[in-house]
Each structure stands twice: as C-alpha cells, then as structure tokens.
UniProtKB/Swiss-Prot annotation:
This is NAD(P)H-quinone oxidoreductase subunit 3. GO terms for biological process: photosynthesis, light reaction. PANTHER family: NADH-UBIQUINONE OXIDOREDUCTASE CHAIN 3 (PTHR11058:SF9). Belongs to the complex I subunit 3 family. The chain crosses the membrane at residues 7-27, 64-84, 89-109. InterPro entries: NAD(P)H_OxRDtase_bac/plastid, NADH_UbQ/plastoQ_OxRdtase_su3, NDAH_ubi_oxred_su3_sf. It comes from Microcystis aeruginosa (strain NIES-843 / IAM M-2473). NDH-1 can be composed of about 15 different subunits; different subcomplexes with different compositions have been identified which probably have different functions. The lineage of its organism: Bacteria, Bacillati, Cyanobacteriota, Cyanophyceae, Oscillatoriophycideae.
Length: 120
C-alpha cells in the first residue's frame, strides 16, 4: 500500500492531529449564535454594568515577576520526576541535578542583582 512501510500510524496520527482543530474551529463557526446588539460587544463584569474602560495597563514589573515565577515553576516540573526516581538513578543523575540547580541559583542571583525582584 504505502511506499514507506511502518509510517502508516504516524501519517494517521498526523492526519488526525490536523483534522481535529480544523473540524473544531469549523463547527464552532457554524454553530455559534450570530447577530446581537451592542450589548454583546461590551465587557462582561460579573453581571454588572462595566464602569470605566476595559483596557488596563499593567506595570511592567508584574511581567518580570511572572517570568521569574515561570522559570522556577519549570524547574519544579523538571526536578519532580528526578526526585521520584532518585533511588534508581545513581550518582551521575545526582550530579546532573546539582548542576541544573546551580545554574538556576546563578540565574536567580543574576536576576536579584539586576533588580528584577525589586518593586520600587
């Protein structure tokens, strides 16, 4: 059938992964309610009439805190499987984890010295 033997499942998976979003977006476009007045375009604020504008500018410092949080959150995601399998991994994995933690500590010290964690 196929010239490339063994790739049938991969091609089927690729086709399914391509069709699911396309079909989902098409179905939502076809099934959504259309029309509506100007009330539909207003910001929903807990069922109350919105007061003021909908565009709020956040301080750039929030983004720095969020970025540092994401970095250390990803660290937790990487270290959790290592901690679960700690007994089976051995000394090499322990040294690799220490190097990983050391790099992140250096990054934290760098961010601290550059003032990324200062609010004022």
């Amino acid at each position: 059938m196929f010239v490339l033997k063994g790739y049938e499942y991969f091609l089927g998976f690729l086709l399914a992964c391509s069709l699911v979003p396309i079909l989902s977006l098409t179905a939502s476009k076809v099934l959504r309610p259309s029309g509506g007045g100007p009330e539909r375009r207003t910001t929903y604020e807990s069922g109350m009439e919105p007061i003021g504008g909908a565009w709020i500018q956040f301080n750039i410092r929030y983004y720095m805190f969020a970025l540092v949080f994401v970095v250390f959150d990803v660290e937790t995601v990487f270290l959790y499987p290592w901690a679960v399998a700690f007994n089976q991994l051995g000394l090499l994995a322990f040294v690799e984890a220490l190097i990983f933690i050391a790099i992140l500590v250096v990054a934290l010290v760098y961010a601290w010295r550059k003032g990324a964690l200062e609010w004022s």
